[in-house]
Amino acid sequence: MIRIITDSVASIPKALAEELNIKVVSLYVNRDGVEYRDADMDHDEFYRDIYDMVNNIPISSQPSQLEMEEAFEEAAEAGDSALGVFLSSRMSGTYDAAVRAARIVASRYPDFEYRLVDGMSNSFDEAWPIMEAVAARDVGEDLDSCEKAALRAIPRTRFLFSPETLTFLHKGGRIGGAAALLGNMIQLAPILTVRDGEATTFAKVRSRKKALDKMATSFKADIDAYGLRGVVVHYIGDKEPAIKWAKDVISPMVGRTVGVVPVSPVIGLHVGPAVGIAYECEKPIPGKITHGVDESIALRLAAALSERIESRLPDLPDLTKLKSRILHDLER
């Protein structure tokens, strides 16, 4: 059996994770000295007070090394293999913690097989590759094929989101105070996205309505050009604007009801109130992954993944062969 492991920032609803047999390792939120497990929190209840948090923004932290090891050890003890897909390594140390944990477990269980994928994003932009791996597992594919399914999904996804205010981004050090003040005064509404594993600006418009319109038209252009495999509407804070946007705008575009899912507070507390959309297309979306020159984006991801591990953990055994195998599989 293949165990699929991820983190709570993927924002997969608890019931869905249980139904799909996805092991979720929780990150943490510390508010006023009290630590909460992200995976166990009622996100809507947390977000009710989000406006009161702006002058004392909670602190987030990654899973403990012990918790990460336990997730992999559960699989090893049962004689199962494991595929881990985690939050972008450029946003958190969670992926690196998974690398260390899997190595330690493998040293205790010599027959334990595992693969790790840097999800290169967060929220459902991270979850779509996980869903592809689950689908591959559930039709009987082997561990390498499940890994390949996740890797190939990464360049097919996009996450667009627009914060209601720039204040949280300023408080979190993402933008300067003057820029936040001026932006709020002129109702600047940036649309953010994730590119090469990092949050960046997708577009800038004036007013919340124009931001929603721009995200909708960009989504429509992408699915017209590259097809659609899945979509959810995300929110941070009040869910009603997201529900309305999903019902009135996004669902009619795709001809079915679109789910509305809260973003993990680990991400939400850095952004503040926001509405967004995370979707996966049938084909790679230009601009999601930009590094390198090879036309095969999935191939570049596999190479970058193993090179990143090699540079940080040079004592890993025989990664040259591992990289060659992944590249060979992806070329087929």
Give short role names for the model-derived ranges.
Residues 3, 13-23, 27-30, 94, ...:
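Mixed-charge interfacial surface used for oligomerization/domain docking
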Residues 61-71:
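Glycine-rich, highly charged phosphate/nucleotide-binding loops
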